[in-house]
Amino acid sequence: MSLNRQEKAVVIEEVSAQVAKAQSIVIAEYRGLDVASVTVLRKTARESGVYLRVLKNTLVRRAVAGTAFEPLSEQLTGPLIYGISADPVAAAKVLAGFAKSNDKLVIKAGSLPNSLLTQDGVKALATMPSREELLSKLLGTMQAPIAQFVRTLNEVPTKFARGLAAVRDQKAAA
């Protein structure tokens, strides 16, 4: 099904809007994937907040022209599926995770703003923790000394109460 000029303009506009919000774009070759597999991949992407779409390469070239993702244009050959996300690691995690279980999906390249990633770069990006994971680790690290201090402060009256209970039990037994 070929698109007419107005439909192409709408697609370019939609993809340009996604690219404007994006922190990462990952492209993968999907040659040989069956519909059921692509449906599972789309569901996973939707749950992770990744915009996943099969597009004509020329339309994507036009959508990324003049943006921080323009270096990716050189990699756009063959049947590709595009993962675009506002989280720098989400698209890489979704596509790399799916590629582990399905060898017909081959990661080709990726891009962060103003930098092109190779296949290995995308896989390395996929192993990084997400922003939420990093924030929770930071918060845990910041709370640990305070929590330990509070437990130490609570231990003094607790020891005193245990001592009183022991004296009471001793007197009750005598």
Swiss-Prot record:
Pfam families: Ribosomal_L10 (PF00466). The gene is rplJ. It comes from Bordetella pertussis (strain Tohama I / ATCC BAA-589 / NCTC 13251). Disulfide bonds: none annotated. The keyword Secreted does not apply. Part of the ribosomal stalk of the 50S ribosomal subunit. The N-terminus interacts with L11 and the large rRNA to form the base of the stalk. The C-terminus forms an elongated spine to which L12 dimers bind in a sequential fashion forming a multimeric L10(L12)X complex. InterPro entries: Ribosomal_uL10, Ribosomal_uL10-like_sf, Ribosomal_uL10_bac, Ribosomal_uL10_bac_type, Ribosomal_uL10_CS_bac. The lineage of its organism: Bacteria, Pseudomonadati, Pseudomonadota, Betaproteobacteria, Burkholderiales. GO terms for biological process: translation. GO terms for molecular function: large ribosomal subunit rRNA binding; structural constituent of ribosome. It comes from the Bacteria. Belongs to the universal ribosomal protein uL10 family. This is Large ribosomal subunit protein uL10. One of its GO terms (cellular component) is large ribosomal subunit. Keywords: Ribonucleoprotein, Ribosomal protein, RNA-binding, rRNA-binding. Forms part of the ribosomal stalk, playing a central role in the interaction of the ribosome with GTP-bound translation factors. SUPFAM superfamilies: Ribosomal protein L10-like (SSF160369). Gene3D superfamilies: 3.30.70.1730, 6.10.250.290.
